[in-house]
């Protein structure tokens, strides 16, 4: 709640800002639309992992380093919802978006990018297809 209030305050003040989300909820759609109505250019950077198990491993690593835990079933649910919402709700409304594969040890790799509902380039067709296919399951 505190973060949402801060985001509303920054929006009202016309400040530039960024926030992190799994996209597992639809609640940011209205926020994006409100921001755009106020003249904001909304950029979405989506850091994708090919499986929910990789997300579970990342959380386990974070916990071993003193971070907070998230139950595996919650991670799986957020993972599925986030991927489904990515191209059905969020990329169609964001002014610019990029999807990155964040699973490689040598850094992130661009998968695709676009402007609203127009895909400008699919850099990694195999990964992009995995994302699209996951939504259909």
Which positions does each model-derived feature cover?
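A generic structural signal for alpha->beta connector loops
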Residues: 39-41, 93-94
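A structural signal for short, well-ordered beta-strand segments and their strand-loop junctions
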Residues: 18-20, 44, 98-101
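Conserved nucleotide-sensing/catalytic segment adjacent to the nucleotide-binding pocket
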Residues: 1-40, 73
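Short, glycine/charged-enriched secondary-structure capping and boundary segments
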Residues: 32-35, 58-61, 113-114
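A glycine- and Lys/Arg-enriched "phosphate-lid" helix/loop adjacent to the NTP-binding pocket
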Residues: 40-86
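NTP-dependent small-molecule kinase module
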Residues: 88-137
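Short, flexible, glycine/charge-rich loop motifs used to bind or transfer phosphoryl groups or to couple energy/partner
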Residues: 7-8, 86-88
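Conserved nucleotide-binding/hydrolysis micro-motifs of P-loop NTPases
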Residues: 24-25, 48-54, 103-106
